Amino acid sequence: MSIAPSNISIGLPAVLLGASTAIFFILERARPGRELPQSRGWYARALLITLVQLAITLVTARLWIRIFGDASVFKLSHWNSPLLEGFGGWFVGTFFFYWWHRLRHARGWWLAFHQIHHSPSRIEVLTSFYKHPVEILCDAILSAVILYPLLGCSVLGAFWYNFFAGTGEYFYHANVRTPGWLRYLIQTPELHSVHHEFDVHRNNYGDIPLWDRMFGTYQDATDFVPRCGFPSGAESRLIPMLAFKDVYAEDPRPAAVKSAATHAALCGALLRGS
């Protein structure tokens, strides 16, 4: 029994995405960018959320084209190159996801959409899609709106979009050191560590630094910040976070201590960028 060529074509970006995942895992262990703290139960939590991410992706992969149909503002599918469709969709998507990311840091939205992702003290490939299922679903919906009714991508173009977007997230969350010049082109692990910095959690929102530079949220960095994530104990409270409880606000440290820590972290960020 032969396999349809379309299935082979669709499988290629998925296989390459899996290969990029494996490559970053290997690089993290062969040449880690810095020593990561130990976090009890981290791998179990990360595996659980990753399985949820995979399930949502598989269930919705072909659903969006049925919902949105063929009507679209643009017709990237007319390029007759799914690879270019995917790259074009990813580039356009970085603009929309920059603003969506900033919105997720606003009070209220943070609870539903983003505190789980910022809770780990370990920033590595596993952290890439460590997100609340609601956030994962909303990301998928936004991607679908960009790809189909806006850009008019084909299904195969959407699979290539997932390859570029997924590999990008794996890259800038990976615990690897990168050449300094890369930070002018794409979000690097060093830049993104600033975004996850303990008691800061801001700036460097975009998959590419262009949007952060344009809209005043770029914070330069050529090295990793000393600490990321939530206070000790808070990051392990996955169930309360899934129930939209603000575990960061429940930090038992006195307000003065939290304020001083935030001030120190921000001063450190300014010094690194000077």
Protein language model features and the residues they cover:
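Cytosolic/stromal cytosol-facing helical appendages immediately following the last transmembrane segment
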Residues: 2-7, 11-15, 110, 119-130, ...
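Membrane interface segments of multi-pass transport proteins and intramembrane proteases
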Residues: 2-7, 37, 41, 62-87, ...
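Membrane-helix interface linkers and caps
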Residues: 20-46, 61-78, 223-227
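Membrane-embedded alpha-helical segments that form the functional core of polytopic membrane enzymes
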Residues: 14-17, 76-104, 158-159
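Core segments of transmembrane alpha-helices
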Residues: 53-60, 133-147
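Juxtamembrane helix-capping/reentrant segments at transmembrane boundaries
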Residues: 34-56, 119-131
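Transmembrane alpha-helical segments that form the membrane-embedded catalytic/substrate-channel core
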Residues: 19-31, 91-106, 162-178, 188-194
